[in-house]
Swiss-Prot record:
Its EC number is 7.4.2.11. This is Methionine import ATP-binding protein MetN. PROSITE patterns: ABC_TRANSPORTER_1, ABC_TRANSPORTER_2, METN. Keywords: Amino-acid transport, ATP-binding, Cell inner membrane, Cell membrane, Membrane, Nucleotide-binding, Translocase, Transport. It is a peripheral membrane protein. CDD domains: ABC_MetN_methionine_transporter.
């Protein structure tokens, strides 16, 4: 459905050349919810704007539904964009228009009849859960309701693709969850292809089938969400995943933590479990086999793409040789172990 082939985007600030996108290649299958995640300035918003030619790539191809948008004339591009809906972080609703009239605007511009507009807008508002808000103005809506109006408007031309540029960033957690559920529901009911740009791995974890990670304008890693969470290959992917299960070191431990081993100190370790290792009784195994004690400070577990993953902070009590053997045992059983320091 969406093919991004060797796309580069260069901006100029005076004589300075800024490579916002560097040789990006992505293939997004029809009906997929595809996430692109990256930190601020990574190039992800530039990428999504290239998909509907709001930003024209410096070079490369952007193929949507079999058509290379980079080769279209202005009139051809205008027509092709009807197949691509888009929602933003800021809802861009017209304050002087009611909910109904905001959703109706693209249909009016397309020259649809009043009867067709009435029918289509009524269907869309019912679809997004705003059947009772036809005559309400944006000023009287919550943030989540405003985004629902924006989604209905984006769907008014029956697009095959929906682009979401940080669509939940301005919303509180509960509202974010409801909007993500709506997007997932629309994907299921309409078989619409959805491209989501976000800086939150929580968004990717909750609704995406596949994900690409971008850093410094480059594609760092891509794959099924379950594969990325289970076997992250890059430091950036690991960083985003860890942020979804943020286990902070307690302050009293920070004050006693040393970088190197000293007599009488014990290692503080962070364990990362993915896939089958989450259910394996490896902690009790190393305690028995290597005659060590484990003090668990904190732990958390979650799901992404049908795969369980978890983090644990623990202090290990035992002699150095036994502790090192236990750590090697964990690593050999596909548990990632990081020694954060030594507690005195």
């Amino acid at each position: 459905m969406i093919e991004i082939n060797r796309v580069n985007k260069i901006f100029y600030q005076g004589a300075k050349e800024i490579n916002a996108l560097k040789d990006i290649n992505l293939h997004i299958a029809q009906g997929t919810i595809f996430g692109v995640i990256g930190s601020s300035g990574a190039g992800k918003s530039t990428l999504i704007r290239c998909v509907n030619m709001l930003e024209r790539p410096t070079n490369g191809e952007v193929v949507v539904d079999g058509v290379d948008l980079t080769k279209l004339s202005s009139s051809e591009l205008s027509k092709a964009r009807r197949n691509i809906g888009m929602i933003f972080q800021h809802f861009n609703l017209l304050a002087s228009r009611t909910v109904f009239d905001n959703v109706a605007l693209p249909l009016e511009l397309a020259g649809k009849s009043k009867h067709d507009i009435q029918k289509k807008v009524t269907e869309l508002l019912d679809l997004v859960g705003l059947a009772d808000k036809h005559h309400t103005y944006p000023a009287n809506l919550s943030g989540g309701q405003k985004q629902r109006v924006a989604i209905a408007r984006a769907l008014s031309t029956d697009p095959k693709v929906l682009l979401c540029d940080e669509a939940t960033s301005a919303l509180d957690p509960a509202t974010t969850k409801s909007i993500l559920e709506l997007i997932k529901d629309l994907n299921r009911k309409l078989s619409i292809t959805i491209l989501i740009i976000t800086h939150e791995m929580e968004v990717v974890k909750n609704i995406c089938h596949e994900v690409a990670i971008i850093g410094g304008g480059e594609l760092v890693e891509k794959g099924a969400v379950s594969d990325i969470f289970a076997h992250p290959k890059t430091a950036l992917a690991q960083e985003f995943i860890r942020a979804t299960l943020d286990l902070s070191i307690p302050e009293d431990f920070k004050a006693r933590l040393k970088d190197t081993y000293v007599e009488g100190s014990y290692p503080l370790i962070r364990l990362e479990f993915t896939g089958s290792t989450v259910d394996a009784p490896v902690i009790s195994q190393i305690s028995r086999e290597f005659d060590i004690d484990i003090s668990i400070l904190s732990s958390d577990i979650d799901y992404a793409g049908g795969v369980k993953f978890g983090l644990m902070l623990a202090e290990v009590f035992g002699n150095q040789e036994s502790t090192q053997k236990a750590i090697e045992f964990l690593r050999n059983h596909h548990v990632k172990v990081e020694v954060l320091g030594y507690v005195v």
